[in-house]
Amino acid sequence: MSTFAEAAHLTPHQCANEINEILESDTFNINAKEIRNKLASLFSILTMQSLSIRREMKINTYRSYKSAIGKSLSFDKDDKIIKFTVRLRKTESLQKDIESALPSYKVVVSPFKNQEVSLFDRYEETHKYDASMVGLQFTNILSKEKDIWKIVSRIACFFDQSCVTTTKRAEYRLLLLGAVGNCCRYSDLKNLDPRTFEIYNNSFLGPIVRATVTETKSRTERYVNFYPVNGDCDLLISLYDYLRVCSPIEKTVSSNRPTNQTHQFLPESLARTFSRFLTQHVDEPVFKIWNGPKSHFGRHLMATFLSRSEKGKYVSSLGNWAGDREIQSAVARSHYSHGSVTVDDRVFAFISGFYKEAPLGSEIYVLKDPSNKPLSREELLEEEGNSLGSPPLSPPSSPRLVAQSFSAHPSLQLFEQWHGIISDEVLQFIAEYRRKHELRSQRTVVA
C-alpha cells in the first residue's frame, strides 16, 4: 500500500489495521525499504485524514508528507513508541488522532523544522530566489521585445536545435505555447481531458479548438484554447504536431476525488524535463534563477504582457484568467484568482497578434493588416483543393460551438492512436487547418 492510488481511498480504520499488521509482523524491520515506504504512505494518509478541513487529498500534499515521514520514521519495539516528523507547524491534534487510531502504541509527531545552517549558507539561500527578481526579469524581457510571440519563438528555436527526438520537440513546444497562449499552469495542460476537445467559433479568429480541465489549482474548471497566432507560434499547428507524434496517456490518480476522466494530455514528468532543458540550453537570465519559473514561464510571461498592455484585469498576480466565482479551497482563494471557465473572445484577438485596439478604444479591435488574417471557416471549407468534399458554408451568426461536421478526411489516419478519445470531427478539423495553413504559407512565399 505504498502508492497514492492504492492508499487514497482507505478509511482511518483500514489504515490503522494495515499499520498494526506491519508492526506486529514477525519479519518486521523498520529499515527495510519496502516496509518503511508502506508505513510512510499509511501515516501520510492518516495525517491528511486528520486534517478534517481538507475537502480532498491531493497527490502533491501526500508526496510532501510521505517524504518527511519516510526520512524521520523510527520505532522502539520494546516500548512501542512510534516517532516521525511531518511538514506541519502544529502537531498536537494530529498526534492525538493517530494515538486514538493506534491505542497500543505511543506516538510522537514532531513538526518539520529546517536544518540549522550557517549565516553564510542562509544568506546564499535567501538570495537564490527572490520574487521581485523574477518580476524584474519578465519586465526586462518585455522591455527589449514588445511582441510576446517573438520572445516565445526565440525560445522555441532551442527545441529544434537541441531536442534529440521529435516527441520531445512536440511536447516542449506545446507546453510553452499552450502555457503562454492560455496564461495557464503546466498542470492545467497536463490534466485537460482529451475527450472534451471541441470546435468553437471565436468571433474574431474563426474556428478554434478548446478542451476542458477540471483539476485546476482552484478546482474551478476552465477551458484551454488552441487558436491561430500571427507568426510561427500558431497553437493549432503546435497541437497538430503533438497529436501526430505523441500517444494518449492514461490518467494518473492525483486526488481522492472520484473522476470518470480516463486520459490526461501531457506526461507527469514533462515539467521536470522541460525545466531542466530550459536551464541547460536557453540563455535567458530568468531560467538561471534557482527555483525560478520554468514550467510556469508561460503564465508569468503572459500575465506581465497583459499587465503592461493595460489588460491586467484579465489576469491574477500569479497568472491565470481572473474571475469572481467562488473558489472552494481557502488556500487557492487566498493566492489564485482564477474563477472563470471562459474568457472574452476579444482577449484572444488581442493576444493572437492579428488584431489591434481601434483608436476609439473601449476594447474595439480591428485587423492590423486586412490582408493578413486568420483562416476563416469559408477558407477551410472552400472547394478549391478541398479534400473535405463539403460545399462552402456561412459562419454561424453567434460565436458558439460550430455544429457542422467535417466529412471524412484522408489525413485522419495521422491521428489513428487518438481515434475514440478525441472526436473525429476535431481531428479532421486540425488536419485540414494544418493543410490550409501550409498552402497559404506557400502562396505567401511565392508572392
UniProtKB/Swiss-Prot annotation:
GO terms for biological process: DNA integration; DNA recombination. Residues 376-401 are annotated as: Disordered. Gene3D superfamilies: Intergrase catalytic core (1.10.443.10). Keywords: DNA integration, DNA recombination, Plasmid. One of its GO terms (molecular function) is DNA binding. The active site is at Y336. Pfam families: Flp_C, Flp_N. The keyword Flavoprotein does not apply. Signal peptide: none annotated. It comes from the Eukaryota. Coiled coil: none annotated. Residues 130-417 form the Tyr recombinase Flp-type domain. PROSITE patterns: TYR_RECOMBINASE_FLP (PS51899). Catalyzes the recombination between the large inverted repetitions of the plasmid. Belongs to the 'phage' integrase family. This is Recombinase Flp protein. It comes from Kluyveromyces lactis (Yeast). The lineage of its organism: Eukaryota, Fungi, Dikarya, Ascomycota, Saccharomycotina.
